[in-house]
Amino acid sequence: MKIVSFNINSIRARPHQLIHLRDTIDPDVIGIQETKVNDPEFPIDEIREIGYHSEFWGQKGHYGVAMLSKKKPENVQKGFTGDSKDDQKRFIQATFKWKRKKITIMNGYFPQGENRSHETKFPKKIKFYDDLENHIKKLKKTEENLIVMGDFNVAPTKLD
């Protein structure tokens, strides 16, 4: 199974990049970050035309994630358990059957958090990581094959 993570920075503005990705790498699953589109405006038909099923969780102007796949997933989760409708759309998960095995793929657009002293952004980053850790611990009890991918917004130095 070929799996690709791609920060597209506006899915409606870059269908040509998805076509190029399909033609050069031919992934089975593409995890997209920064779709920057509300769900009702997501380009479902355009994605279908290039050969992919789409699951998405977005909001206008920023954030937003999607999972594009050649085969429809068995199960999809949008956001973490306990997220409110006002939470940023940063996490999507899909479970696929692949060669008689179940594979759960988590795709996130992780908050960058500014710096540790930022009063709102850094706590949101910590909450996202805590939610993800708790989610993975819960999944590990029943799932064998887990993949976490996305734009982690982490750099080892200030040169990002």
Where are the predicted features?
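Metal-dependent phosphoesterases centered on the DNase I-like endonuclease/exonuclease/phosphatase
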Residues: 29, 50-51, 128-160
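Active-site-proximal beta-strand elements of phosphoester/diester hydrolases
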Residues: 1-10, 102-115, 149
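A short secondary-structure junction signal
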Residues: 116-121, 157-160
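Soluble or luminal CAZymes and related metallo-dependent hydrolases
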Residues: 10-14, 86, 124-131
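N-terminal, active-site-proximal structural segment of metallo-dependent hydrolase catalytic domains
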Residues: 1-52, 57, 62-65, 156
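Short amphipathic alpha-helices and their capping/turn segments at secondary-structure boundaries
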Residues: 20-22, 90-100, 131-144
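Hydrophobic anchor at the start of a short beta-strand
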Residues: 3, 73-75, 146
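Structured beta-strand-rich core segments of catalytic domains in phosphoester-bond hydrolases
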Residues: 35-36, 42-117
